[in-house]
Amino acid sequence: MSIEALRARLPDYAHDLGTNLALLVDDPALDPEARWGCFVASACAVGEPQTLRAIDAAATAAGLTAEANRAARKAAAMMAMTNVYFRAVHLMEGAAYQALPCRLRLNRLAHAGARGVTYDLSCVAVSAINGCGACLDSHEADLRGRGVEPTQIQAALRIAAVVSAVARTLAAEAALHPQNLEI
């Protein structure tokens, strides 16, 4: 399924989501690898099958390498774990928990398979979807320290927001109208 086919599956009330999706596919704020990495990572984070398949196919068609695609999926997988942990530690506000080492294996963060900026932008996108302020702050500071502009980080956030909204809308429509599901 293409991005256009994905847009066509959106109900009329979600027209703005489809428009935003189309605009973000060509957004020049990010280079193609970073842009499509954010799309793939966001789709993996949300996990809605139609959205994930369409975005994965579109990313491949747009030239995202298999290695960069795996890196985006790694970002989604690692953030699924770290976002829960660090968000909980942050929300508990207990100094004792913040002082403890997390003791979670994080080797894949260092061996991502994509340029570091691309990987961290994907982590920002997934952390936004998962609502982890601590991870957002950490990755944003790292990106800014490497010269990434706020507009580039904002583009990752916008991709996350739109992919999440598209996926959740399609999931809601599938629950309400299962007879319309694509086989």
Swiss-Prot record:
UniProt KW Oxidoreductase keyword: yes
GO biological process: response to oxidative stress
Name the record gives this protein: Alkyl hydroperoxide reductase AhpD
Pfam families: CMD (PF02627)
Catalytic site positions: 132 (proton donor), 135 (cysteine sulfenic acid (-soh) intermediate)
Disulfide bond positions: 132-135
Top-level lineage group: Bacteria
The keyword Acyltransferase belongs to this UniProt entry's keyword annotation: no
